[in-house]
């Protein structure tokens, strides 16, 4: 079916889109009403159980790590594997950070730093995700992926925050980690916001998550507190997302928020942290006879759930709205106080 591309202007309240029915009396209806706002988790077991129980509405799982360098564009900043700041060029290549001085048409390499987490081996590797420069702070993001003997894997997103008051010799202030693959990064209100999505390990006997997703600070790690989790109404894989707020001034994790389900797009501004996830909606009609055959109509459509959090240490959820179609691209225009979303409808 031919796709139509639609540009949609969303005000800060994120108005709801409408998903049309399937147009046949025998065809089951698909409604956005099945997508309700995430609810706060009451305890750890509720989170672990939610990760093990699925609703039958499919959600895209995070992409497998492929070792390639990522380039991500978000509101107001450019996050990539190369950053230019005050005549200095920072280049991130896998686990190596090179610092060059640009003068006219020539460049001089000044320094090379090993920024690996020390997890690389025959069964694991680390690859570059993003660089971000904000004032005298440099954020370096990598993902470490590993494969266990039973062919199960794990991914951990690492953030290293440097002081670049002396650009050629960055000083490491602190390292942070959070389970999952890197999804996006941005800065607002003196904070660095980092988003990752991953897959939880499941205990097959109990049907619940064997462990809670972890966050780390230097060498210490802990489970994401259940009080910081929101449970999605639509989940068809044991997936989760973590949003961390890190203070650029004192290099401390100021807050964390987590969701069941993955995040596909990230936009950050002073107006909020905007997250989008794709949802594949399916529905089956009742079986009926036609030409001596038993027929069951099957409807499939795509939807997107938009979430808006405060861009502060609390990361409070302000709004959740479902939209028909999949988000292809978006841009946050802070001056117009609006979010522009391009989505595709089948």
List where the protein language model places each region:
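Intrinsically disordered regions, especially transient/low-confidence alpha-helical propensity segments
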Residues: 1-2, 19, 159
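Bacterial N-terminal signal peptides that target proteins for export
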Residues: 1-9
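Hydrophobic core
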Residues: 14-18
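Beta-sheet-rich non-transmembrane sensory/scaffold domains
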Residues: 22-346
